[in-house]
Amino acid sequence: ISVKGRQVWMSENGTFAFGFSQVSRDHYVLGIWYANIPGNRTLVWMANRDQPVGEGGCLTLGQDGNLQLVDEGSTIWMAETTGLFVQSGEMQESGNFVLYNSNRNIVWQSFASPTDTLLPEQQLTETLNLTSWNSSTDVSTGHYSLKMVRTPVSLKLALNYNAPSGSSNYSYWSGPEIFEGSDTVVVSLDHSGSISMSYSNSSNGLLYIYQNSNRLGENERILSRITIEHDGNVRLYRWDANNGSRWIVDWAAVSRPCTTAGICGNGICKLDSKSKPQCHCPTGSYQLDSTRPSLGCLPSRPTPDCRSDNNASPPYKIMTLSQTKYYGGSSIIANYSNISSMSGCGDICLSDCSCVASVYGISNHKPLCWTLKSLLFGGFQDLSYTFFVKVSLDNGTLGNHRAPASSAPSSNREKEKSRLKMIVLGTVLGTAFVLCLFCLFFLSQHIYKEKKRNFGCFNFYSWYSCKIFLRRSADGDQQFQTEAWN
């Protein structure tokens, strides 16, 4: 199978296809997608999501039995089946691509290495996870994952935000817990469209995460999938062939989008009038990229170095963001339950050099306060909480704070653009001036010769004059030209 050859390996009834799929200009992934539905391809598995291949991409089975993806002589991905005596492969109707040995035993399968989607008959174990795309158009590994997390006596399915720094992650949603036994716990999606946790070799202890109440016929099946998406939510999709031929969301883990950790990077998420999430930066910081608010915010000035003996740091104050909660996770310095007042939570942060913010709230009629050493996982509107941010006294006011030109990368870029424009304008005007002088010199010589030949007086207005005009070429470039006129 090669990119140039455009070969596709179909399942028996044509439900799924295995082959190369284009993800951007001149970039392809080896993947599996639904082959019998109209519209854009819905990929359910990818081998090389983080390293797409070009037109030279080719899938080969080596003499050692290893299935590998090669591009321009370099191995991009391999199934690691060396020595397993691979004899054949099959694209199954379930969406699973499998490799068999001579005894028809499965030695490798795509179901055992999922990307962002779980299909019926596929099982998610504790050692596997689903990982989101990086954006709606970028298939590379994103910052969200769906996996089972362990408690002292149980397992539960959880959504996790993996901070871009890679230093820590935060679980912001979890399903019901299932107690551990001697058997492996699996998460699966059945053909009726229900999601459950169970023990792999037993029907006992079945625990539904979502149960579809619509009854299907005995042999009736629907196209369905569980997909974790770039916005941090995991959704159960069902293909509706009767009403517009489209994917319909039957269930979603997160019902309030702003409660998704990292939806605004380390910024604050608020819903607009249309209930769509909008990203804001806490006072004392600015957006890293206004066109990609999910990248989060950067501080306008560096945080104090508490290890230094230098006490020349600028004085700080606490700014209050009411009705705002901020995720803590590994950023929490300490928890306090003996805070006598809301303002006391801010005062604790102000007196702690390592604290950059603190959060106050009421839980079970008891006050809570936690201090933070960094802002990593983002915040959102919540009536029960108050967010305190430490800022320097000269930092400005509340709102979407923009850094001064000296510290904001975007401002530096604007200054560079202005400087470049001035250079281009100066060069163009200088060139035009030189051309005009050359034209005048040429014409003056011509007139002098005419005068010398005619021995007569001449009228000033009989001089040839020079004009410069601007012409735009067919390809949009601007070109200066000169011409003589009288």
Q: What are the functions of these language-model segments?
A:
Residues 482-486:
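Protein kinase glycine-rich loop
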Residues 450-475:
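Cytoplasmic C-terminal tails of single-pass
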Residues 348, 475-476:
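Residues within well-formed alpha-helices
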Residues 1-450:
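Beta-rich ligand-binding surfaces for carbohydrates and other polyanions
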